[in-house]
């Protein structure tokens, strides 16, 4: 019974607090994003800046860093992992491996965090 209640509370919380404005990489410019192969973090930021819509950038600026990360991990972050990291982009993967970042989730997290800080001019 305890597990059922916990499960129900998790589902309710997800529905109540999981109202995500999708910034979906695949909805931006699918053909362009698939063709682009950034080689390092700077190129990732430049390509995101080029491909995200102005309204999405403005929306991102209204979020805290944690909110942006939580909202984008399964949307924009998944697009980054699928299109840039897992689709055979050895230069970008090598860049992150050289930095000691081994898992695609961590790689996309670094890209997302860096992009957020680029947009909001946070220098941490």
Where in this protein do the model-derived segments appear?
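A general, composition-driven signal for non-globular sequence regions
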Residues: 13-15, 31, 75
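Bacterial Sec-dependent N-terminal signal peptides
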Residues: 1-22
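Compositionally biased amphipathic helical and low-complexity segments enriched in hydrophobic
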Residues: 5, 26-29, 42, 108, ...
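A near-ubiquitous, low-amplitude feature marking generic local secondary-structure context
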Residues: 8, 24-27, 31, 35, ...
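Sec-dependent signal peptide cleavage junction
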Residues: 17-46, 50, 124
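Compact alpha-helical subdomains of small soluble proteins
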Residues: 55-124
């Amino acid at each position: 019974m305890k597990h059922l209640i916990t499960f129900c509370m998790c589902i309710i919380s997800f529905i109540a607090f999981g109202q995500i404005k999708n910034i979906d990489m695949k909805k931006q410019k699918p053909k362009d994003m698939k063709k682009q192969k950034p080689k390092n973090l700077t190129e990732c930021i430049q390509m995101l800046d080029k491909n995200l819509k102005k309204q999405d950038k403005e929306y991102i600026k209204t979020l805290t860093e944690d909110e942006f990360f939580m909202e984008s991990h399964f949307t924009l972050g998944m697009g980054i992992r699928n299109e840039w990291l897992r689709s055979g982009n050895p230069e970008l993967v090598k860049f992150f491996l050289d930095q000691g970042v081994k898992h695609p989730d961590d790689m996309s997290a670094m890209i997302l965090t860096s992009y957020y800080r680029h947009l909001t001019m946070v220098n941490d």
